[in-house]
Amino acid sequence: MRPLTDEETKTMFEKLSKYIGENIKLLIDRPDGTYCFRLHNDRVYYMSEKILKLATNVSRDKLVSVGTCFGKFTKTQKFRLHITALDFLAPYAKFKVWVKPGSEQSFLYGNHIMKSGLGRITENTDKYQGVLVYSMADVPLGFGVAARTTQECRKVDPMAIVVFHQADIGEYIRSEDTLT
């Protein structure tokens, strides 16, 4: 387990800023202590500095996971967010999409959100902006990327895709063996 390099930190923070904007600072300097990001086996973990000190007593080859997995770096050094980061990103989300109850299940199975399933969308959402997807009861369901701006969503055909699927809480079941 090691600290992220400058390039890795820049790549990860660019990805996080698509979803939570400048609120990244609030992830690091929290009222309950200082938190940090560490890399282990191409996965980025988010943990308190207390847990970090305790984890140094475990050898690298024996350490499976520590803290919360925020995502992983691909072989081409792109950063992919994991669904395990949802609980930390949801309170700070800048752009949100609410899904109608009939389309929740479709999204949780890994499908994109159609206009017919769109309940609400945050004003001034840009095209290809990272959004957090919520149920109409304000329960965070996952991440997505806006396929259209807020204004385009109002005029588009009901079967057009408005949010591209990135990750959802159904992955806890579908990918339970690969989430660490």
Curated annotation (Swiss-Prot):
Family: Belongs to the NIP7 family.
Chain segments carrying region N-terminal domain: 1-92
An example Gene Ontology CC term for this record: nucleolus
Region described as C-terminal domain: 93-180
Function per UniProt: Required for proper 34S pre-rRNA processing and 60S ribosome subunit assembly.
UniProt name for this protein: 60S ribosome subunit biogenesis protein NIP7 homolog
Principal subcellular localisation of the protein: nucleus
UniProt entry tagged with the keyword Nucleotidyltransferase: no
UniProt-listed PANTHER family: CYCLIN-DEPENDENT KINASES REGULATORY SUBUNIT/60S RIBOSOME SUBUNIT BIOGENESIS PROTEIN NIP7
Pfam families: pre-PUA_NIP7 (PF17833), UPF0113 (PF03657)
Subunit text: Monomer. Interacts with pre-ribosome complex. May bind to RNA. Interacts with NOL8. Interacts with FTSJ3.
Keyword tags: Nucleus, Ribosome biogenesis, RNA-binding
Any GO molecular function: RNA binding
Domain PUA intervals: 94-170
Lineage, uppermost ranks: Eukaryota, Metazoa, Chordata, Craniata, Vertebrata
Presence of keyword Oxidoreductase: no
Origin species: Danio rerio (Zebrafish)
